[in-house]
């Protein structure tokens, strides 16, 4: 059975803060940070935005792009590490907002930055089994980094929704296969009640990101009998600009393959939306017949790899909703004081 992406939608808040502004507060070297991270500014949610509102906006764009009846959606899964409620699903909010309720199932996913792609895989399973007609998978976050912590320079806000189906005439992209690589690696964590996550610093690199991304990618390539040169585009989880660039080189992918989907320099790390944002940006540009190789990463730790082929339908649906490039243009820049207010870093009680 053929399973794939019927539609997709993204959302990025319009507010931005530059690396220079954060560095100014903490006395850090902005140029060294920009060169090391390959990130120059990051998205900031508005005061009334959270992972749920971002997920709703992304889902609405996916529905506008698809043109399908929302009552056909049998499952809504939202992946995030910043769900607004500890007990109250984000996914029911999204489902109600897009008109998919009540004859459907919903659940929230957590797996650090790959919760969104885990939701995609779950939807693939439900759709493939015939249990549901369509499944909506979302990755959305308003990620947090403690003041002056390295994460504060990249932790951003944004989300992407993917409508998964099996009707070949509706598919804008076919998901040929997927492969996951998972271990218990404590590279990044946040306990209940902690306002900010903690991490292992450099430990998040080799034993975390690179081990899982490269093994996940190699596993799928071997499973398919494919090579990097078989693909027109490649997307890897984007905690910064340096890591996906290095991972691509390690695996044999070129700079030309990853550049179209490399959005992190302009918006930062959208966590659960990160890899999906790269896929969305690539779908915005890809032609029918193009192949996309994507690998998401989530701390804790694991990776999900996907092989995707774009269909003719992409040309029909692409411009029905804002593209990623349209969403990130014309930003509104704010200073650290306003950023702290937007991010809830100023606590009065």
Curated annotation (Swiss-Prot):
Binding site for CoA: 202, 242
Keyword Acyltransferase on entry: yes
EC number of the protein: 2.3.3.10
GO MF term list: acetyl-CoA C-acetyltransferase activity; hydroxymethylglutaryl-CoA synthase activity
GO biological process: farnesyl diphosphate biosynthetic process, mevalonate pathway; isopentenyl diphosphate biosynthetic process, mevalonate pathway
Keywords of the record: Acyltransferase, Isoprene biosynthesis, Transferase
Catalysed reactions, semicolon-separated: acetoacetyl-CoA + acetyl-CoA + H2O = (3S)-3-hydroxy-3-methylglutaryl-CoA + CoA + H(+)
Pathway given in the UniProt record: Metabolic intermediate biosynthesis; (R)-mevalonate biosynthesis; (R)-mevalonate from acetyl-CoA: step 2/3
A Pfam match: ACP_syn_III_C
Keyword Acyltransferase tagged: yes
Self-association state and partner proteins as the record states: Interacts with acetoacetyl-CoA thiolase that catalyzes the precedent step in the pathway and with a DUF35 protein. The acetoacetyl-CoA thiolase/HMG-CoA synthase complex channels the intermediate via a fused CoA-binding site, which allows for efficient coupling of the endergonic thiolase reaction with the exergonic HMGCS reaction.
NCBIfam families: HMG_CoA_syn_Arc, PRK04262.1
Entry similarity comment: Belongs to the thiolase-like superfamily. Archaeal HMG-CoA synthase family.
Function recorded in the entry: Catalyzes the condensation of acetyl-CoA with acetoacetyl-CoA to form 3-hydroxy-3-methylglutaryl-CoA (HMG-CoA). Functions in the mevalonate (MVA) pathway leading to isopentenyl diphosphate (IPP), a key precursor for the biosynthesis of isoprenoid compounds that are building blocks of archaeal membrane lipids.
Listed name of the protein: Hydroxymethylglutaryl-CoA synthase
Organism encoding this protein: Methanosarcina mazei (strain ATCC BAA-159 / DSM 3647 / Goe1 / Go1 / JCM 11833 / OCM 88)
């Amino acid at each position: 059975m053929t399973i794939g992406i019927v539609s997709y939608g993204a959302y990025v808040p319009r507010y931005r803060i530059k690396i220079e502004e954060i560095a100014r507060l903490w006395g850090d070297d902005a140029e060294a940070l920009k060169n090391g991270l390959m990130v120059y500014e990051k998205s900031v949610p508005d005061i009334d935005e959270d992972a749920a509102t971002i997920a709703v906006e992304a889902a609405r764009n996916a529905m506008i792009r698809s043109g399908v009846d929302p009552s056909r959606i049998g499952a809504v899964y939202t992946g995030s590490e910043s769900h607004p409620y500890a007990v109250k699903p984000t996914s029911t909010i999204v489902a109600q907002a897009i008109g998919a309720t009540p004859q459907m199932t919903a659940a929230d996913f957590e797996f650090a930055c790959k919760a969104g792609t885990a939701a995609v895989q779950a939807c693939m399973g439900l759709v493939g089994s015939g249990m549901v007609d369509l499944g909506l998978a979302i990755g959305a976050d308003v990620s947090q980094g403690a003041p002056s912590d390295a994460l504060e320079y990249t932790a951003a806000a944004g989300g992407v929704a993917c409508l998964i189906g099996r009707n070949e005439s509706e598919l804008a992209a076919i998901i040929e296969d997927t492969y996951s690589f998972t271990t218990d690696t404590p590279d990044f964590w946040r306990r209940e009640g902690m306002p900010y996550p903690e991490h292992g610093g450099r430990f998040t690199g080799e034993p975390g990101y690179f081990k899982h991304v490269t093994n996940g990618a190699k596993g799928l390539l071997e499973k398919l009998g494919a090579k990097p040169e078989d693909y027109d585009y490649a997307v890897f989880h984007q905690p910064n600009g340096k890591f996906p660039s290095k991972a691509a080189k390690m695996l044999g992918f070129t700079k030309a393959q990853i550049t179209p989907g490399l959005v992190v320099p302009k918006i930062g790390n959208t966590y659960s939306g990160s890899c999906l944002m790269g896929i969305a940006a690539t779908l915005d540009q890809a032609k029918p017949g193009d192949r996309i190789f994507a690998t998401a990463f989530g701390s804790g730790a694991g990776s999900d790899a996907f092989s995707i082929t774009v269909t003719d339908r992409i040309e029909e649906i692409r411009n029905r909703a804002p593209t990623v490039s349209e969403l990130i243009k014309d930003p509104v820049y704010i200073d650290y004081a306003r950023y702290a207010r937007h991010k809830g870093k100023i606590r009065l009680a």
